[in-house]
Design a protein with these regions (language model features):
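N-terminal leader/auxiliary helical segments
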Residues: 1-190
C-alpha cells in the first residue's frame, strides 16, 4: 500500500483511487495456476511485467478500468522490484535474533514505517472500495476476485500498527529511499 500511495502521488495521469487500490490488491486474489496462465515468466521464474502492461490499449479504457490496470501493474512491478532490491537494505541484527524472530521483527518494523507514510490515506476511500462492482470488464484479468480484494483491503485498514518496532534493524531513511527509487523507476517505465 505504501508503494501504491507513492505511485498515486507521483503519477502525472489522472487516477481513480478506489479502482487503483482494488486493482493493486487483485493479484493476490488469483489462484496460483491461473496467475501463471495470465502472466509470462522466464525460466528463472521472473515475471515479464512490461509484457503485461503493453497488452492494454489505455486509450480504449475508461478512467476506472485504466486505474484498475495501473494498480494491478503497480503490484506486479513492485513485487519484482522488491525481489531484486530488498537485499540492498542493511539489516543490523545486533540483538542476535533467531531467523524467525528476525523475520518477524523486520516485517513489524517495515509495516510501522509503511503506516507512518500512509497515515490513513486510504481510509477516506473505504466506502467506495466496499461498493466496488464485481464486474470489471477487462478480459486479460480473468481469475481475479473483487470480493476477495475488497476483503483484503478491509483487513489491511483494520490492522493495528505494530507496537514492537526495531528501528535499529533497518534504517527508516534507507527503506524510504528504496521505495522512492522504485517509484521513480516505475514512472519511467510507463
Amino acid at each position: 500500500m505504501h508503494f501504491g500511495k507513492l505511485f498515486i502521488e507521483n503519477s502525472e495521469s489522472e487516477i481513480h483511487i478506489p479502482s487503483f487500490i482494488v486493482g493493486m490488491v487483485s493479484p493476490e486474489t488469483i489462484e496460483e495456476d491461473d496467475f501463471e496462465d495470465l502472466h509470462t515468466f522466464d525460466e528463472d521464474g521472473n515475471m515479464d511485467v512490461r509484457e503485461f502492461y503493453e497488452q492494454f490499449d489505455f486509450k480504449n479504457l475508461n478512467l476506472k478500468e485504466k486505474s484498475f490496470v495501473l494498480g494491478y501493474y503497480c503490484h506486479l512491478w513492485f513485487d519484482e522490484y522488491y525481489k531484486f532490491n530488498a537485499s540492498k537494505l542493511t539489516v543490523n541484527n545486533n540483538a542476535d535474533l533467531t531467523d524467525e524472530e528476525l523475520s518477524l521483527a523486520v516485517k513489524s518494523t517495515l509495516r510501522n514505517y509503511d503506516s507512518k507514510y500512509i497515515n490513513n490515506f486510504f481510509e477516506k476511500y473505504f466506502k467506495e472500495i466496499a461498493g466496488f462492482k464485481e464486474d470489471i470488464n477487462i478480459k486479460e484479468l480473468g481469475g481475479i476476485c473483487i470480493k476477495k480484494a475488497r476483503d483484503k483491503i478491509a483487513d489491511f485498514l483494520s490492522e493495528d500498527v505494530p507496537e514492537s518496532v526495531y528501528p535499529q534493524l533497518i534504517d527508516e531513511h534507507e527503506y524510504m529511499s528504496l521505495m522512492k527509487n522504485g517509484c521513480s523507476k516505475i514512472m519511467r517505465s510507463l
